[in-house]
Each structure stands twice: as C-alpha cells, then as structure tokens.
UniProtKB/Swiss-Prot annotation:
It comes from the Bacteria. Its cofactor is Zn(2+). This is 4-deoxy-L-threo-5-hexosulose-uronate ketol-isomerase 1. Zn(2+) binds at residues 198, 200, 205, 247. GO terms for molecular function: 4-deoxy-L-threo-5-hexosulose-uronate ketol-isomerase activity; zinc ion binding. Catalyzes the isomerization of 5-dehydro-4-deoxy-D-glucuronate to 3-deoxy-D-glycero-2,5-hexodiulosonate. It catalyses: 5-dehydro-4-deoxy-D-glucuronate = 3-deoxy-D-glycero-2,5-hexodiulosonate. Belongs to the KduI family. Its EC number is 5.3.1.17. It comes from Rhizobium meliloti (strain 1021) (Ensifer meliloti). CDD domains: cupin_KduI_C, cupin_KduI_N.
Length: 280
C-alpha cells in the first residue's frame, strides 16, 4: 500500500520566536495531508500525537503497522479518532465495517486491530482525517454522528466569532483515554476562532482547517502571547500547537476546523485565558 510517515520534533518557544516563515511552517504546519490513493501520517513528538489523511481511491488502504510507534500493530498501544470530511466511505476495524458519511466520526480504542479505509465512489472519495494518541486501556469503538456530538455555542456576531463547537470525542459523548476531538462551525459573517485567545500547557492541540474555497486563506496566530507569529493556511492544511502557544485564526472567507487535543487531562474548559493587553 502507499503510506508515508514524517516525524516532527518538539519546537520550544525561544526557537519558534527566532524562526522565519518557512522555519515556522517546517516546525508546525502539515501540508498535503489528503492525496488520492495515499495514507499520509505525521508523527509529532508533542504528546506523541499522530495526524493523518487517508484518501482511498479505487483500492482499499490499510493502516496496520507503523514502524515509528515501535509496536507490532498501529493500535497496540494507541487509540484513534477518524472524521470523514469527504464523500461516503467505510472504515474497517478488525472484521467490522463502519460506514461514515460527511462529518461523521469513528472512535477506535486501543487494540482495535488493523484499520481499513475504502471510498464508496472513487470519483468522490472519502477524506478520512485520522488522529491517534497513546492509550493505557481499551475503550469501546463508537460511531459518532454530528447529531450525537455535544453542542456548545460561543461568541457573537458583534465580535465576529459566533460559532458552534461540536464535541465528538468528549467524556459526555464517547469514552476515550486522552483524545478530545471536535468540529467547529461558524455563523455567516463570523471569521475569528479562539479569540480571545488562551493556552493550555497541560495539553497540545492540532487544528485542521477545511470547507474553504480555493482562494480562501486562514491567518493562524501562534506563539507565546507576548511573542506572537502567524502562518497562512489554505484548505486541508493542519497546524500543530504546543501547550505554550496560543492558537487562533481569522479567515478571508467561510471555513470550519477540526480540533484535537491530548495531554494530562480531558477537561475542555481547563485553559489559561490570555487578556487582550497581553498579546503582542
């Protein structure tokens, strides 16, 4: 099969503050995630999160052994969450098939076995976004629809940040070891995400931006509050966020994003808010 794995080392705040644009992208941005007929994985040393894009074309794709994990099988010591942001497709866990429509998710517990991916229509392929973190126990596999997700409305039109957070892998929806995963949608005219900003030193986070027109761009802000930087992202690009960094963005047009966290706790509200006067 066609699978690639890249490794990202940890970048500290002092190093990040000295980097130019390409240096920031090399350290934090994940490009070309979704390529037809390929499974592209990025192994980040931030809480050992694996971020992947799987696009089955005519042939089924399988993730079973990833040498970088040091285990016989990918899920021997890991859990995973998979969200489909493309056409309808099927994810196989061991010998059981799960059909995922657009914006439907599958949580797979530790020891679930090989993961198989197939598209219903190769001309409108599924786009499977894969997130995986180390696990210490097995939790049940759960198929999660958007209706099942816990809804949280935040922001306002006046602040240009009215949005709905759909919590997919969350203690109130789906048992997991440490993964937290959700999808944020915006009201028309709202462009800002995660502003006012915050940090959570106890957890890393990764954003995947999607649902964008070809010319739309996200100006994603990162860095320590007093040393902010930005990267410009297009559709289907992801960005890693260490615990010390803010993670906020504004779009030139409509967009959505998937967020995922791993770390010390599973409290979505455990964050250190950053006052506006602290941002530079």
């Amino acid at each position: 099969m066609t699978i690639s794995v890249s490794v990202r080392q940890v970048v500290g705040p002092e190093d990040a503050a000295r980097r130019n644009t390409q240096g920031l992208r090399d350290g934090f941005v994940i490009e070309a995630l979704f390529q037809p007929g390929r499974a592209n994985l990025t192994y980040s040393h931030l809480d050992r999160m694996i971020v992947g894009g799987v696009v089955p074309a005519a042939d089924r794709l399988v993730i079973d052994r990833v040498a970088e994990t040091g285990t016989q099988r990918f899920l021997d010591r890991r859990e995973a969450a998979i969200i489909n942001i493309g056409g309808s497709g099927t994810v196989s866990v061991g010998d059981k098939d799960h059909v995922l429509g657009f914006q439907e998710a599958l949580y797979v517990g530790m020891g679930g076995g090989a993961l198989g991916f197939a598209s219903d229509d190769a001309n409108a392929p599924a786009l499977f976004y894969v997130l995986s973190a180390p696990a210490h126990r097995s939790c049940p596999t759960v198929h999660i629809t958007r209706d099942m997700a816990k809804k949280l409305s935040l922001g306002s039109a006046e602040e240009s940040n009215a949005r709905t957070i759909n919590q997919y892998v969350h203690p109130d929806v789906c048992e997991s070891c440490q993964l937290l995963v959700g999808l944020t949608m915006f009201e028309p005219g709202s462009v800002w995400n995660t502003m006012p900003a915050h940090v959570h030193d106890r957890r890393m986070e990764v954003y995947l931006y999607f649902g964008m027109q070809e010319a739309t761009r996200i100006f994603h802000f990162m860095g320590e509050p007093g040393e902010t930087r930005h990267v410009v992202l297009k559709n289907h690009e992801a960005v890693l966020s260490p615990g010390w960094s803010i993670h906020s963005g504004a779009g030139t047009g409509r967009y959505a994003f998937i967020w995922a966290m791993a770390g010390d706790n599973m409290s979505f509200t455990d964050m250190d808010k950053v006052p506006m006067e602290a941002l530079r």
